[in-house]
Amino acid sequence: ATDSVYLSATNSALVGGDFYTLVRLPDDCAVMILGDVSGKGIEAASMSALVKTALTAYAWEGAGPARMARSLNSMLMGFSRVETFVTAFIAKIDLKAGRATYCSAGHPPTMVIRPESMPLGGDEARGGEVELLGCQSGVIGAFESMVYETGVFTFAPGDMLFMYTDGTIEARDRTGAFFGEQRLRDLLLSVSGEGVSGICGKVLGELDRFTESALDDDIALVSLEFLRGRS
């Protein structure tokens, strides 16, 4: 189950550099991608479409997240006349194993929401928590020699993956204070018991309240809930 929302800072048209896609693969596997291409408007939207297409192709070729980032980096570095930087979170998810590998290339830390669970049999109850995925690599398209690392996380049914672009935590209120990572974590934990449906809308609503409807960057939010045997 997934939930997503996109808001462009370009008021004249709903275009921008943020993009996301879920690629469903055979054998209960999937690749989740959220990215942010430098710039705004039509040019950023055009480049984000190209980047999204390339990453989707790499996913179908069976590449892992770090290899996908390396391949995209090589492609962008080959565009000698175009200086484009991309931040991206790429996760390859094995739903049967309850395990995923990921590469976070210059991207804000993705969060795994683990809602409070009731005990089953002799098990102990699990308190709710929000885990930051801390394995970080550099941006894509900056240096040919950039190294991209692979991180791993596990998940249980009911856990949720929350991905967002930097405009989320960099949103400011009228005093100049950032919305920030901790405020986002606290908000996600407070709504985690409600499930994935509408969670992105709740975050966007809080951002709108915090900034007094004055968001000045493209924002993409994607939440994915892990269910038994499917996403």
Map each language-model feature to its residues:
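Short, charged, surface-exposed loops that flank catalytic or proteolytic processing sites
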Residues: 63-68, 191-200
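Cytochrome P450 core scaffold surrounding the K-helix E-X-X-R motif
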Residues: 112-115, 172-178
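… and, occasionally, acidic/histidine-rich disordered N-termini of signaling adaptors
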Residues: 1-162, 209-231
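Short Ser/Thr-interspersed hydrophobic loop/turn segments at strand-loop and sheet-helix junctions
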Residues: 168
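ABC-family ATPase nucleotide-binding domain "signature/switch" substructure
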Residues: 171, 208
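Short, glycine/charged-enriched secondary-structure capping and boundary segments
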Residues: 47-49, 176-179
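Divalent-cation-assisted or electrostatically stabilized phosphate/pyrophosphate-binding catalytic cores
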Residues: 156-157, 177-192
